[in-house]
Curated annotation (Swiss-Prot):
It comes from Bradyrhizobium sp. (strain BTAi1 / ATCC BAA-1182). This is ATP synthase subunit beta 2. F-type ATPases have 2 components, CF(1) - the catalytic core - and CF(0) - the membrane proton channel. CF(1) has five subunits: alpha(3), beta(3), gamma(1), delta(1), epsilon(1). CF(0) has four main subunits: a(1), b(1), b'(1) and c(9-12). It catalyses: ATP + H2O + 4 H(+)(in) = ADP + phosphate + 5 H(+)(out). HAMAP family: ATP_synth_beta_bact. It is found in: Cell inner membrane. The gene is atpD2. Keywords: ATP synthesis, ATP-binding, Cell inner membrane, Cell membrane, CF(1), Hydrogen ion transport, Ion transport, Membrane, Nucleotide-binding, Translocase, Transport. The keyword Transport applies. The lineage of its organism: Bacteria, Pseudomonadati, Pseudomonadota, Alphaproteobacteria, Hyphomicrobiales. The keyword rRNA-binding does not apply. InterPro entries: AAA+_ATPase, ATP-synt_VA_C, ATP_synth_F1_bsu, ATPase_a/bsu_AS, ATPase_alpha/beta_chains, ATPase_F1/V1/A1_a/bsu_N, ATPase_F1/V1/A1_a/bsu_N_sf, ATPase_F1/V1/A1_a/bsu_nucl-bd. GO terms for molecular function: ATP binding; ATP hydrolysis activity; proton-transporting ATP synthase activity, rotational mechanism. Its EC number is 7.1.2.2.
Length: 476
């Protein structure tokens, strides 16, 4: 973090330490402003950064530390920076892994002296600056492009419990979108495992997209203040590329729910009374502070894709419901589908997008998507009857619907590039036209007599045709 403070810094001293929260006393009449940065000196080479959150009295502030407070004691000196905490931005951070306060954490060289710094707190773009894009953001993932298309400059989130594939989807999207759009990617890892961050860094290096990517990590072992502000640090980097360098940016956040959890920890340490289900009373405003800054302006856009952990698979959870309200596309991951190895485990009925409109995606795409949904919904309605009585008890029309629904669900599975090491299957990126053609052929009955396995984990439908031809040849 650059020392971008005023020429004269106001000094004070610690009067109390409550875990990650510290109280600092300053001279009368020079109290730092809310959200201003505080540097707490200690014997170690790296000082502790904190952020002002409360004014307790005319001479005392309460601040949240963004680093480890172990070793601090009352009486230690502290300095107000005169500005909010700032993060490095621009080309200097591309290919680098930073912590929540913008310090390199990848054992690489120090950032160059010419690096530009920018405060992590900023206002959302004014309404007259916003640009309304209706350009579809193609991901190459069949089920998303068909049923929950993303918009360039919009916000999408993947909802799911633990272990259903959110992080794998995020990693695949980084790879495919950087290759397709040649833009900048900014990844915020909030409250996730160190192992996952290491794997992501290696994957980005191996795929050659790291030079166009900046990573910001606030890992699960770090203090809540660091996890709480890692998202704003990453967003500030993305805003600089959008506003100053006029680049289109892909902002990926894994995991927004961990940011909410960190905010809850901070809220408790600050002494605020919890609200519904124990969440912080500022839940809505904290989520909005992040989400409303993710926007498109004339000439450049920030497209955001976020992973959201759903506690106990409860989609009525207040934090999950609040995040839903800010999105253009919602991609819901199903534990049932994951248990059946139907990857990506995207629920075709629960997932939705405001972009799935005939005026935006075209009449053919809209009609095919609706037929796919209707067919799968009909199959799910019949599943209980099938379990009790068997498929033979269904009418011929219902049996045909079941047959096509099961083949559609298998066609919408897809191997990913980032999972080749685990599955041994080469990843596929599929154009929307190929996805629509494949679904249309299945709906029209072409695959009625094919083995379901022929459609499983493929890209385009032609692969299934080849499997069927090979199978027929082997049997003849």
């Amino acid at each position: 973090m650059a020392d971008a403070s005023h020429d004269t810094q106001v000094s004070g001293h610690l009067t109390a330490i409550h875990g990650s929260v510290v109280d600092v006393r300053f001279p009368q009449g020079v109290l730092p402003a809310l959200n201003e940065g505080i540097v707490i000196d200690r014997d170690e080479p790296t000082p502790v950064l904190a952020e002002v959150q409360q004014h307790l009295d005319p001479v005392t502030i309460r601040a949240v530390a963004l680093g480890n407070t172990a070793g601090l004691s009352r009486g230690v000196s502290a300095r107000a920076l005169g500005t909010p905490i700032q993060t490095p931005v621009g080309d200097a951070v591309l290919g680098r892994l930073l912590n929540a306060v913008g310090k390199p954490a990848d054992r690489g060289p120090e950032l160059p002296p010419s690096t530009v710094f920018r405060p992590i707190h900023a206002s959302a773009p004014a309404l007259n600056r916003l640009g309304a894009s209706q350009e579809i953001f193609h991901t190459g993932i069949k089920v998303i492009d068909l049923l929950a298309p993303l918009v360039k400059g919009g916000k999408a989130a993947m909802f799911g419990g633990a272990g259903v594939g959110k992080t794998v989807l995020i990693m695949e999207l980084i790879r495919t979108t950087v290759e397709r759009y040649s833009g900048i990617s900014v990844f915020a890892g909030i409250g996730e495992r160190s192992r996952e961050g290491h794997e992501l860094l290696l994957e980005l290096k191996q795929s050659g997209v790291l030079p166009r990517t900046a990573l910001v990590f606030g890992q699960m072992n770090e203090p809540p203040g660091a996890r709480w502000r890692a998202g704003l640090t990453a967003l500030t980097i993305a805003e600089h590329f959008r506003d100053v360098q006029h680049e289109n940016v892909l902002l990926l956040i894994d995991n927004v729910y961990r940011l909410v959890q960190a905010g809850g920890e901070v809220s408790g340490l600050l002494g605020r009374l919890p609200s519904r289900v124990g969440y912080q009373p500022t839940l809505a405003s904290e989520i909005a502070e992040l989400q409303e800054r993710i926007a498109s302006v004339a000439g450049a856009a920030i497209t955001s894709i976020q992973a959201v952990y759903v506690p106990a698979d409860d989609f009525t959870d207040p934090a999950v419901a609040e995040i839903f309200s800010h999105l253009d596309s919602s991609i819901v991951l199903s534990r049932q589908m994951a248990s059946e190895a139907m990857y990506p485990a995207v629920d075709p009925l629960a997932s939705s997008s405001t972009l799935l409109d005939a005026r935006l995606v075209g009449e053919g795409h809209y009609r095919t998507a609706q037929e796919v949904r209707k067919t799968i919904a009909h199959y799910r309605d019949l599943q209980e009857i099938i379990a009790l009585l068997g498929i033979e008890e269904l009418s011929a029309i219902d049996r045909q619907a079941v047959k096509r629904a099961r083949r559609l669900m298998r066609f919408l599975t897809q191997p990913f590039m980032v999972t080749v090491a685990f599955t041994g299957k080469e990843g596929r990126t599929v154009e929307v036209a190929d996805t629509l053609a494949g679904c249309r052929a299945i709906l029209d009955g072409e695959a009625d007599n094919w083995a379901e396995s022929s459609l499983y984990m493929i890209g385009v439908l032609e692969e299934a045709r080849e499997r069927e031809r090979a199978s027929a040849k082997a049997m003849s």
